[in-house]
Amino acid sequence: MAKIPAPDENGKPSNGERNYAEHFLDPFLKALEQIDVRPRIIDNYESYESGKFAEKSRIACEKHNEIRDIIETISGRELAEDWFPFNPYGHDGSLDRVTVTGFEWPYVYWVQDGVEGKSDLNKAEGKLPWRIDWPAKWGWVGVTCEPFGKDHGAAGGSYATGKEISKLFGDNPPHPLVYEWISLKGQGAMLSLIHI
């Protein structure tokens, strides 16, 4: 989202002065300001860029077999044979068709469409998959209580895997605060399932 230009007034990519994330975050922050809520914003892309995820990314890469086992055992789903707990950006800047071929701190080596490359874990040259990014963030941000929808709190859900991954990172997982889904009249339940 940080590299995608915000849409212009016609819905087309703009000149890139603002990115897609900023475009949709700004109205939300303005609405919060109207009710005197002033949150601390932690930009995920900037956090990767400044190296805040580097140590957790290193641990994830070094302990990729343990993380695979946690996810497969708790969630009950089998990960792809070439799965790796860090998704590097390929030569074209995307995550598509990128296969990790090795890891030696601070680099993850990869191949995309026959082109080989490496991504530095100290920079925003890739990211952790969401189920690993979430508990990684708990540790360095210092999260002590994490609210989430009941789907994330279900047996085998993302909190259950995140809790164990957090311990693998050497952190204490936050206390869970599970909430019910919100329903909008005529639209049914608003699920977070699409974000898993």
Predicted regions and their residues:
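Intervening/peripheral non-core polypeptide segments
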Residues: M1, I194-I196
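N-terminal Rossmann-like or analogous alpha/beta NTP/dinucleotide-binding catalytic cores
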Residues: M1-R68, G162, F169
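Alpha-helical recognition segments enriched in aromatics with Gly/Pro capping
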Residues: K63-D69, T73-I194
